[in-house]
């Protein structure tokens, strides 16, 4: 019975997620399935920008994309299998979220079963322990608990099932293994880009896992991977998938210099996040990004010292752990295309769990202070802290989705009204309000135009009957990660740039380093035809524009994350 404990752990840790509902991208994807949004199709639910200015124009002119969105923005990810699973859930289970979370739980248990099978083959002495660490890994919390992120679990499940078949083919001569692994690799890539990261283990195994062998033999072993990846790259380009124009997602093929510039900090941030079990500070608290990078710089020599002290003496076992570690490092590299976060490390966790289990087992047998140093560090980072995340994330998601629903309901949107978000320091009501209104079955506005989503105070000055100037104080627009998702620094704006919206035109009046600090909006209709709102730190609140010549000051309000962590406070 003990041999199956890892599967029980995988099942139990995902249970809290079953109590949460739908959140963020779930709202958008469910809206597409129900035919409420026409920017993409049911089998392309991860298309958030097609790279086509004409196709994106209505979503900028009417909203909810902010006015500064790059017209050619491309955020188009090729995940047809994962899209199909979401369509299945939506059409079979409807508005009931819990069965869809149970569906995710089953995938997570299957993933843990595949990992356990690999560990029994590769690290039999610590297989069950490694699989428990794997099941607890906080890198899996969001992929297993957020429906829109399930694609990562599905992708690595198939790829690592293919790795099992690959090992049987290469080490035991199972001839069907080549075909089975090829099919599994293809299914994994059809589920999501995380499958590419998971393939790093196959490459690492062929590179150093089999010891000395002719290059021709290594090439033979890599043939299934090469075939699938080549077909995948062709499909990716033919379907015009990829990312361009966003600072959040950088395509290493189309934007190699931007990728290389961002890669070092992102690499060490990811290493530190995994080594010390850090929560997603990079995303939630941008001011802590330097600390996250520093944690990775500290973790690197600590990891090397732990290896020197506690690595197994057996040469074959050291070689196995070495190729698993190399595979884990290789799995991190594709994640550098986007911002550092624990959920990107799903593919890296296979090798890390085996490595940590082996080192912890050796540390436990050590003597003196070294033993407790290793046990406290590795045990705390890879056991205790992840357990807290499995409980905390569902609570946070449930709280955020409830508060977001309360915030948009409080606005009492009228069917067909023209809503203008003057300022929202919180990105959820700024850009997710319309999908959330669809999910809630509330009346929909005709337009939802976002003028500022900078985390700054704003002055709104009425300069004429139908003219408004908006100036951010103490900073710049498009300078936070959520804003840069819509326009990267490589696409600067200049004073005089004009952006047409529906019944309004935005003109950039002043910039700082290509990022606006002041803009003018000319309204085509009387002010009474628009509904002006702002995020006050609690709800979306309606406002009345000041008289001509007067200024309205909107303070910097708390975000939902800040309110959740620090408690409520008045706007600055």
Give the positions of each predicted feature.
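Polytopic membrane enzymes that build or remodel cell-surface glycoconjugates and lipids
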Residues: 1-429, 433-438, 443, 504
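C-terminal luminal/periplasmic domains and tails of membrane-associated envelope-modifying transferases
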Residues: 409-419, 424-572
